[in-house]
Amino acid sequence: MSNEWKEYVSDPRTICKYGAKCYQKNPDHHKSYKHPPNLKAKGKDRQRTRFTPYDKKPFKADSEDVKPQSQDAILDSVTNDDTCAEKLSDSTPSPNNSKEANRLIEDNHDNYYGKETNNNIYKECFQVEMPDDFFKFYECLNEESSSIEHLMASVNLEMIGPFDLLLGKLPKLDNKDLYLVHWRFFYDVPEFQAVLKKKGKSELHIGYFRDNPNDKPVFLAKNDSSKDCIITPVAENIFAAVYWFLQNEKSSSPFMSIACQKLSEKVKKWGESNGYKVEEYEKKSRIKIQICKTFHGAGIVVPYNKKTQIGYRKLVESNANIKKMFQKLEEASGEAEKSKVLSEIQPLITYSSIALDECDFGTGLEAGMALFCSGIQELQSSATSLLSSSYTLLKREEFAKIIQVHMKHRRKGPDVALWGNKIQ
C-alpha cells in the first residue's frame, strides 16, 4: 500500500459516496469528505465554478420513469447529465382518507406504555424530545381535574400525539416507525409535531415547530389540513398557544364561553407563575433568522455563509410560477398533458439536486417542501428524495426518517391516529 493510500485509509473524514467519480469542485465539500488519492491529485488544479441555474436550457422529459429513492439516486442522475425526468410513480402510495385506510393498527393491544415522563422514551418513539413546557402543562391540567381529557373536551380540545404517551394510551408496537405518523396530518412537515387538536371532524391542530430535531422547539403553530398547508406560528410555549385557542373558541358558542374563560384564567396564571409568557408569537423574530419563507409559510433555517454564499440559493422558479405549474398538473386531464407539465416542473427538481451537491442544502429543502406541500401524488417521490437528501446533508437524520415514514403512510382527514377513528 502506497503512502497516499495509507494516508487515505487513516483519514478520519467521511468517505465521499462518489469516490473516484466525484466531480465536486467546492472546497467545503473536500474539507468534509475524503477522496481516493488519484482524485485528490486531479482536484488540485481544478477551478471552483458554482453552477448557475438561471442560465437554463429547455428540458425535454425522458420517456422512462425515474424513481430516485436516496441521495445517491438524486445526485447520480445529475452526475450522468441526465434530465432525470420523473413521471407518474407507483413508489409512493396514494394518500387515503377513508376511515378503514386511516387505521394503521388493530385495536386489540393489551400492552401499553405507562404514563411516561422519561424523555428518552419520547426520543425513541417520536425522534425528538419534548420541551419542559409540555410536561408543565400536563401538571397544570392534572392539578385542575382528575380527568384531563374531559376537561379539555369541555373547551373543544383534544390532547394528541406525544400526549398519548403521558396519558398511558400509546400501545407498544414492534414497528416503532409507525409512531412517527401517529397524529401526523397530511401537510405536517417533519419540523411540525401536533400535540393538540380541535375536537370532532375539524382538522385544526396545534403543534411544536423545530428547525433541528435535536434543538428545542422555536414556537407552536397551527394548521388546518382540510384547508391548506399553511403553518402559522401562534406562541412560544404551550400555555400561550392554549390561551390563544381558548380566547378564539369562547366566542364561538355561549355554551363554551364559561368553560373557556375559566380554563384560560387557570392556564395564564399557572403559566406565568412558572416563567412562561402567555402572549402571541412575535413573527418578526422568525423573519430575521429564516433563510426563505417556504410554501408552508413558517420558513426554514439552515447554515448560510454570507461571504461564500454557500448554504442556500434561490429556486430556479418563483413561488408564483411553481404554484401555477402545480395547478396545471392538478387540472391536467390525460397522461400526455400530465407528462408535459411534469417536464416543465423537472428543472426545479434537477437544479435543486445540483444545488444540494454544491452544499446549498437549503435549496433542496425548500424545493422538497414545495413538492410536499403541493400534495400532488405524481410529485411525492421527488419530494421524498429531495427532503431525505437535504435533511441527511444537514445532519437532521431524524427528520429524514420522519418524512420517509410519513410519505409511506400519508393520510388525509381528521382521523390520523394510529388507530384511525377508533376511540381509545
Residue spans for each PLM region:
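Short secondary-structure junctions and interdomain/linker hinges
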Residues: I148, S202, E249-S253, N274
